[in-house]
A protein has these predicted regions:
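Hydrophobic core segments of alpha-helical transmembrane domains in multi-pass membrane transport
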Residues: 12-24, 36-46, 77, 81, ...
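Membrane-embedded alpha-helical segments and adjacent helix-loop junctions characteristic
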Residues: 31-94, 154-229
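Non-transmembrane accessory domains of multi-pass membrane transporters/channels
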Residues: 321, 331-408
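Transmembrane alpha-helical segments and their short flanking loops
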Residues: 130, 174, 185-197, 259-363
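Membrane-interfacial helix-loop connectors
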Residues: 81-86, 90-118, 123-138, 143, ...
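Alpha-helical transmembrane segments and their lipid-water interface positions
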Residues: 39, 52, 88-92, 119-126, ...
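Interfacial loop-to-helix junctions that mark the boundaries of transmembrane helices
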Residues: 2-7, 24-34, 127-137, 190-197, ...
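The feature identifies polytopic integral membrane transport proteins across all domains of life
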Residues: 58-61, 71-79, 102-112, 190-191, ...
């Protein structure tokens, strides 16, 4: 079954490469847009690599100190996602710490809620800055200095280099997407394929989900949506549906990240799915009410009537914040539901040698790795103790009770 799964993945990849190659031959504009997405995703990988360089103690200490209450957990999720521009990395860190027992499920869910709000900063960055200036000019010096720092032997300088290079690639990717859609206007108008009403809402929402699953990044999908909207290649209403879809589609990344984690990590991924799907459904049901709120807010904030990119960023912010506000009072019920769905396996007497705490996710960061190794060492000690006591036909409780050897 596993072999068949790998074969299907390879066939799908080959088919995807063939289709893309054909599209690139047919249109240089599609090549520019695809290159922009690829550069943007590479920038996100560089950013993640850079922040991982600071995860050898500092990030872990900050996480433990700033997540002891729900508001702090949400705040941590917002700030770290804003800095890293990757809710996926924040999710991975949260799952790792939860799997190692360094934070509770309650705290982990708080971080995920904050990360969802934090993703909106990417939309504001692109809509408010990326489309208004020649962002590529800022990218070049970042790439030069970033590369210079990457080749240094000092780990922290190398980390700074990856962060600078990552930001440079993000900006360069946005510029390529922007230019690609601008050039598209002269050859084809994608608005001809716009669909209005709830039919269009559902169709474009599923397109947003699919795009996010393919790119494994809601940030990249959102940037693509905003650049297309800025070039007047999609309608505002369809862009809102795509944004909702990108929010729902990002849960796939959380699910994939939890596959190698422990039970608690799977619970956190489940919470992520429940929140994003429920928020998406809520946004779809009240889409027109959200649009009215955005219009009033845009007028109050001085946003131009035809500045739909900023309105999209405002919409994305509103439906994520309202989703968090509605979720917080129901957290205890959500945790009960997750505990019911993900039940711990009962350890049988003949399974004393099973690994309990070690998992790939917890080994991603230094502090979590040390913690799970310590717990696993204690578990191994208990296993050995049990095996030896059974071999000697004595009870473990008697050995630890302080009884004399003769009495045992």
């Amino acid at each position: 079954v596993k072999h068949k799964g790998i074969t299907l993945k390879r066939i799908a990849l080959l088919l995807f490469v063939v289709i893309l190659s054909y599209l690139f031959i047919q249109s240089k504009n599609i090549l520019d847009i695809a290159a922009g997405v690829a550069i943007f995703l590479f920038g996100m990988l560089s950013l993640e690599e850079g922040f991982r360089a600071f995860a050898g103690g500092f990030l872990e200490k900050v996480l433990q100190k700033t997540t002891n209450t729900l508001p702090k957990s949400i705040g941590f999720g917002i700030i770290t996602t804003t800095l890293m521009q990757s809710s996926s990395l924040v999710s991975v860190i949260s799952i790792s710490f939860l799997s190692a027992g360094l934070i509770s499920l309650y705290q982990g869910i708080g971080i995920i809620l904050g990360a969802n709000i934090g993703t909106t900063t990417g939309a504001w960055l692109v809509a408010g800055f990326g489309l208004k200036v020649d962002i590529a000019t800022y990218a070049m010096p970042m790439l030069v200095f970033g590369t210079l720092f990457i080749f240094q032997s000092n780990k922290k300088l190398k980390g700074i280099g990856y962060v600078l290079a990552g930001l440079g690639f993000l900006f360069l990717g946005i510029a390529y997407m922007k230019d690609g859609f601008e050039a598209f206007k002269n050859s084809i108008d994608l608005r001809e394929y716009a669909i209005s009403g709830y039919k269009g809402l559902f169709i474009f929402m599923f397109i947003g989900i699919f795009a996010t699953v393919v790119m494994q990044s809601s940030h990249a999908t959102l940037v693509l949506i905003i650049t297309a909207l800025g070039a007047h290649q999609i309608t505002y209403e369809n862009a809102l549906a795509l944004a909702i879809g990108s929010n729902v589609g990002t849960t796939i990344t959380a699910i994939l990240g939890s596959l190698s984690s422990g039970l608690e990590g799977k619970k956190l991924a489940g919470a992520h799915v429940i929140f994003n799907v429920a928020t998406g459904i809520f946004a779809v049901i009240f889409i027109y009410q959200f649009k009215e709120i955005v219009e009033y807010s845009a007028e109050f904030l001085g946003i131009a009537k035809d500045d739909f990119t900023l309105k999209l960023a405002l919409f994305h912010t509103y439906f994520n914040i309202i989703g968090v506000i509605l979720t917080v009072p129901l957290l205890s019920y959500m945790i009960k539901l997750l505990n019911t769905i993900f039940k711990s396996k009962t350890i049988q007497k003949d399974e004393v040698d099973d690994v309990l705490f070690l998992n790939d996710t917890a080994l991603d960061f230094a502090d979590t790795a040390v913690n799970v190794l310590h717990k696993e060492a204690i578990h191994l000690y208990n296993n050995v103790f049990t095996i030896i006591s059974k071999g000697l036909s004595v009870y473990k409780e008697d050995i630890t009770s302080g009884m004399e050897v003769e009495d045992i």
